[in-house]
């Protein structure tokens, strides 16, 4: 018994280790098909890269029509399924004029057609490769597309954007569809001349416990180990001096729709030492749909970067970017929607959205106005990113619904100083935590409903920070995580209700020192170390109410070094020990049912004190209540029967013997045993 009582929360027996290893092996087998599919997909992408390189090889031979025709035919093989969905694009608008671009048409360059275009005109570009830096300034209601839906025109550029758009009004519209954009990078001398200064972009990153303060500039860029980035901090004027001068598509004012396009940064040929976005959006509205946005394995790229912009991204694939798939800096007037997209194989993060001024300031600015920040992340696959899958910082009104966060290198998703809803998502096999809810500077009041957290390498849900009052509610599966189902620490005070928490390798719920939680109406079972554990300074506000707590190979509830705590109306059964209290003070247990636990229903040890009122302690396979090591209990109106030993008091606790018999209903062969040779 001494050995048992001195066990800490960090002990686990050899059988649990074996079980953990078996589950890890099974998990690897189950993901084999997914990884195989990903490898096949990467092979297809390698072929796409080769196709992009062919464009460079024949750039100086662009007038050789035979080679050009063959090249464009090869390009059309890329992502065949996307083309099938969009080959019959039908834009029913009536246009006043149609401007055609090509060697056989009136306009030989795209820029010439743009310059001549009027509102309600459409520009159709014949198949071919156009090396231009197209500028659309002061135009509205213009459509730009390929002449042949089955043969995309290619706009090729380096040093400057393939296309830069600056309308007169935000309501002015430009539509772009069925075009391929290729950017080949930025020369260092061009970049320096742009006054793209260090101060406008900084990152603090950690790599293998070694910290760097990283500048996005030539001298320091070699230190950038983005593939293992743990944190990204963006200052207010990120990319301000750039103003979209270095990207594939730059949107600086207006409402721009990009549909059924392909944007590739895979064929960078210059020694680019800047971070290159595929799409840059500032103070504008961008709608990006059915578009493939490819990064580069060797150079620093971002899929989409937006600053103070409205962003709607739908059914896009954004992949292989070394600085993140989507990065967005928002204010109180912005709306960010990402739906039905695939964000895969990006380094640093799949998706990052943050407010610079903070959540409270955003809410204050939004008061009395119709404008309010909206973030909708719905039905996306955020998978295999070499970093965090999704990271939201200082945001409110976030709706994270129906996404899959799978096999990301760090955490599946992180919400820092946020509120909103996280509903019906899957967090599975991420190498860190499934979901991190953190309060650093402001409160976190996120509501976590009906999600699945399975086989994450750390915790299913990690909750931390002062004023973290998040709600964990109705999640049907928090299971198979290699540490804890739910981990509460660093002053957090969440509410955890109506969840199924089971088969986690450490604890179902762990509440550490200086934190507390309301744990109510959950089913918590078959967790390997304990079903619920809490203890340490300030954990005494923890309340465990109306739960079913069963089938743990160790303790149903384990409490150590806690002062206070309320455990009421729970069913605690089929555990090795129902409840263990070590060095605790003033624990209040009432109206609980303890039955069919293997060793003890309730153990008080190491000078613990507790009040037990109206509990039913029946049919446990050894001892009903064990009080030892100078512990003191106040027992009243408890029903104690049909245990092998109803009540056991160690030598230094015998003064409670008559008190227990008088105030409680103790029935059975052994009412009180003064000594026990087993412990």
Regions found by a protein language model. Give the residues of each.
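PEST-like, low-complexity acidic/proline-rich intrinsically disordered segments
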Residues: 1-18
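Acidic, Ser/Thr-interspersed intrinsically disordered low-complexity regions
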Residues: 4-8, 39-91
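Acidic Gly/Asp/Thr-rich repetitive segments characteristic of extracellular carbohydrate-active
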Residues: 93-131
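Extracellular beta-strand-rich solenoid/capping regions of secreted or surface-exposed proteins
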Residues: 111, 115-119, 131-145, 154-232, ...
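Short glycine/acidic-rich loop motifs that flank beta-strands on beta-rich extracellular proteins
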Residues: 131-135, 157-163, 184-192, 210-212, ...
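All-beta strand scaffolds that present successive hydrophobic residues in beta-strands
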Residues: 143-145, 174-176, 202, 232-235, ...
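Short acidic, low-complexity intrinsically disordered linear motifs used
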Residues: 676-679
